[in-house]
């Protein structure tokens, strides 16, 4: 562990107002110190490194020029907000980032008045900013609203919907396009290509060359002034105008996002111009700027674990089992080797979802559509129409963004699209914005859709094979973040019978019915209950929909207590089981049914096991639910023979 960086100027900054009297040279020094502080802090906590390093100068310049928090700065996604937090009175807590009870890794309204809008998902900043701009204008407040959005986020349609609206409304809104040429995976699609062309367009280069020839003939003082003016005017003359101008934005840029002497004058000019209508400032930055390991491998330093500042080497605990993501990726490649119709679709997350393995093995059969979940789902529906077998791999929380497409374009038409839902359940340090806790509730209500939930990595392998062979309609498989439980994965996984669960452990009196990875907690609860003379039956539902009615009826008939356990929100598996048991009259005989699910509230960042404990779905909570149902004290034992056999 290295000593903390020396930051004499940063030590004097208590908030953004302290930056407003600084010179450009002092702002440059402050940026260097903020960068050093951020690197040191993230080396301790882990988190999103590359994005924040790329916007240090921009962050300092924004808080120097604008009157925050009265003026609003909205950070799209929020990955890049660490320098912002350091400058806005949270430096003393910056080494608690993403820790339980510590600072959020994203902007959070409850955390600071300098966070006017919460973030976590991409492409929301312009819409929120436009709403704030119009709301402020209606209230008679003359404040500035700045939305900072990355080039990767500009691949989502929502950003253009907002820009189209802003241009038509002629509202005063400042959008800063942070063009670092790098989202988590290289940005894809027409937008990124357009930005690259903008920087090197023939029309611009020819004009610039002519201007340089003229400027070279001027006296030295005029030449220097003209060169500076030329730097600030880049991009404003591009022949036929720009896409942004067509949307009604006044375009400024591109400018160097690491030159304080470029940023400050441009931001100040835009602020003081008082122009009606939206403005877009195109700022070019480098992801990972100022830290060589992150500059050289920006994809590896987007999100990091704890690391050595000097070497850049990240701490990696030796895995006890392969991750669920890795298992999915490996099994999908194996299935694709046997069936040329299998293709993969991801929304800018090939590495995060394991589809990078498919892209390596079969590059023509893997499609990264950018941050565009709605498009990804309907694109997959089109692939299915042509006889292909698309696997759409998305994080659970991001699938929410394409829900209408799931309903209207896939499920309603019974198209055989396969949804691989990663990060299902609690996700730990990424907190509420990334928690995958709602998918069972919003998918379980859809006709025609099969939903599988993996209890361990071996089950996941079987579910990939099951999905690959399911051609009669859409099917989803959900699995959590992190490592598996260490069970052996079959070399040749066999498909599961649709809608059939399994008994994992036979017992009597009490039945624990788990879906997904809560199975391990149920088995742990059995060990605790054994000390009290109880031997519960443990079952794995496997399928949310259709669930195994025969299995549920059997458990209800043979036990006095049935505990349903899920790592999902209210309205999920437990609700389906309770409704079915009620309608079948299987609760009329006195069966004690309890449903353990995530309570009706959001859970902020913490270790997943802590989140589960707080939610009341861990082994201890299951044990308590059993004892409460039997009306036993937690220290009591029971005569097992008295329970229903």
Swiss-Prot record:
Pathway: Metabolic intermediate biosynthesis; 1-deoxy-D-xylulose 5-phosphate biosynthesis; 1-deoxy-D-xylulose 5-phosphate from D-glyceraldehyde 3-phosphate and pyruvate: step 1/1
Top-level lineage group: Bacteria
Catalytic activity: D-glyceraldehyde 3-phosphate + pyruvate + H(+) = 1-deoxy-D-xylulose 5-phosphate + CO2
CDD domains given in the database record: TPP_DXS, TPP_PYR_DXS_TK_like
E.C. code: 2.2.1.7
Keywords noted in UniProt: Isoprene biosynthesis, Magnesium, Metal-binding, Thiamine biosynthesis, Thiamine pyrophosphate, Transferase
Binding residue positions for thiamine diphosphate: 79, 120-122, 152-153, 180, 291, 373
Keyword Repeat belongs to the record: no
SUPFAM superfamilies: Thiamin diphosphate-binding fold (THDP-binding), TK C-terminal domain-like
Region forming the signal peptide: none
Residue sites binding Mg(2+) per the record: 151, 180
Cofactor: Mg(2+); thiamine diphosphate
GO BP annotations, alphabetical order: 1-deoxy-D-xylulose 5-phosphate biosynthetic process; glyceraldehyde-3-phosphate metabolic process; terpenoid biosynthetic process; thiamine biosynthetic process
InterPro entries: Dxylulose-5-P_synthase, THDP-binding, Transketo_C/PFOR_II, Transketolase-like_Pyr-bd, Transketolase_BS, Transketolase_C, Transketolase_CS
Binding note for cofactor: Binds 1 Mg(2+) ion per subunit. Binds 1 thiamine pyrophosphate per subunit.
UniProt-recorded Gene Ontology molecular function terms: 1-deoxy-D-xylulose-5-phosphate synthase activity; magnesium ion binding; thiamine pyrophosphate binding
Role description: Catalyzes the acyloin condensation reaction between C atoms 2 and 3 of pyruvate and glyceraldehyde 3-phosphate to yield 1-deoxy-D-xylulose-5-phosphate (DXP).
NCBIfam families in alphabetical order: dxs, PRK05444.2-2
Binding partners and assembly: Homodimer.
Family: Belongs to the transketolase family. DXPS subfamily.
Name of this protein: 1-deoxy-D-xylulose-5-phosphate synthase 1
Gene: dxs1
């Amino acid at each position: 562990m290295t000593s903390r960086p020396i930051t004499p100027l940063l030590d004097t900054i208590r908030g953004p107002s302290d930056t407003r009297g600084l010179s450009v040279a002092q702002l440059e020094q402050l940026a260097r110190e903020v960068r050093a502080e951020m690197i040191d802090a993230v080396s301790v906590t882990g988190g999103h490194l590359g994005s924040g390093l790329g916007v240090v100068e921009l962050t300092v310049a924004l808080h120097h020029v604008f009157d925050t928090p009265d003026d609003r700065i909205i950070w799209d996604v929020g990955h890049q907000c660490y320098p912002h937090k350091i400058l806005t009175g949270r430096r003393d807590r910056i080494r608690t980032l993403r820790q339980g009870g510590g600072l959020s890794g994203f902007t959070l309204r409850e955390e600071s008045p300098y966070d006017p809008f919460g973030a976590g998902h991409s492409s929301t900043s312009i819409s929120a900013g436009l709403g704030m701009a119009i709301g402020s204008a209606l209230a008679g407040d003359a404040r500035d609203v700045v939305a900072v959005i990355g080039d990767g986020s500009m691949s989502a349609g929502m950003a253009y919907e907002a820009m189209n609206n802003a241009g038509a409304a002629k509202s005063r809104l400042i959008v800063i396009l942070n063009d670092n040429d790098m989202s988590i995976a290289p940005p894809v699609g027409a937008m990124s290509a357009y930005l690259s062309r903008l920087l090197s367009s023939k029309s611009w280069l020819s004009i610039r060359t002519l201007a340089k020839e003229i400027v070279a003939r001027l006296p030295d003082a005029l030449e220097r002034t003209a060169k500076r003016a030329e730097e600030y005017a880049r991009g404003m003359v591009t022949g036929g105008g720009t896409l942004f101008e067509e949307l009604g934005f006044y375009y400024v840029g591109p400018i160097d996002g690491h030159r304080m002497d470029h940023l400050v004058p441009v931001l100040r000019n835009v602020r003081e111009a008082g122009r009606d209508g939206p403005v877009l400032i195109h700022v070019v930055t480098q992801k990972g700027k100022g830290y060589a390991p992150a500059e050289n491998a920006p994809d590896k330093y987007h999100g990091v674990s704890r690391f050595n500042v000097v070497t850049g080497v990240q701490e990696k605990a030796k895995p006890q089992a392969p991750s669920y993501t890795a298992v999915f990726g490996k099994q999908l490649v194996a299935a694709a080797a046997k069936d040329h119709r299998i293709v993969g679709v991801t929304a800018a997350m090939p590495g995060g979802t394991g589809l990078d393995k498919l892209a390596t093995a079969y590059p023509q059969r893997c499609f990264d559509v950018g941050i565009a979940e709605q498009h990804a789902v309907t694109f997959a529906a089109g692939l299915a129409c042509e006889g292909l077998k698309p696997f759409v791999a998305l994080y659970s929380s991001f699938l929410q963004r394409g829900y209408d497409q799931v309903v209207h374009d896939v499920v309603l038409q019974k198209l055989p699209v396969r949804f691989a839902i990663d990060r299902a359940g609690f996700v730990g340090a990424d907190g509420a914005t990334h928690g995958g806790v709602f998918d069972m509730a919003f998918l379980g209500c859809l006709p025609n859709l099969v939903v599988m939930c993996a209890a361990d990595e071996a089950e996941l392998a079987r579910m990939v094979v099951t999905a690959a062979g399911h051609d009669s309609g859409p099917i989803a498989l959900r699995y959590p973040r992190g490592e598996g439980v260490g069970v052996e994965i079959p070399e040749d996984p066999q498909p599961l019978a649709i809608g059939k669960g399994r008994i994992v452990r036979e017992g009597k009196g009490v039945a624990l019915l788990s879906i997904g990875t809560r199975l391990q907690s149920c088995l742990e609860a059995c060990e605790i209950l054994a000390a009290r003379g109880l031997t519960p039956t443990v079952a794995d539902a496997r399928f949310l929909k259709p669930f195994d009615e025969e299995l549920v009826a059997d458990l209800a008939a043979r036990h006095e207590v049935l505990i349903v356990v899920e790592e999902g929100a209210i309205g999920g598996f437990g609700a389906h089981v309770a409704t079915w048991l009620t309608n079948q009259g299987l609760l009329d005989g006195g069966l004690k049914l309890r449903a353990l699910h995530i309570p009706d509230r959001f859970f902020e960042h913490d270790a997943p096991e802590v989140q589960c404990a707080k939610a009341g779905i861990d082994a201890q909570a299951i044990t308590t639910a059993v004892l409460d149902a039997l009306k036993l004290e937690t220290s009591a034992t029971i005569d097992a023979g008295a329970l229903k056999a």
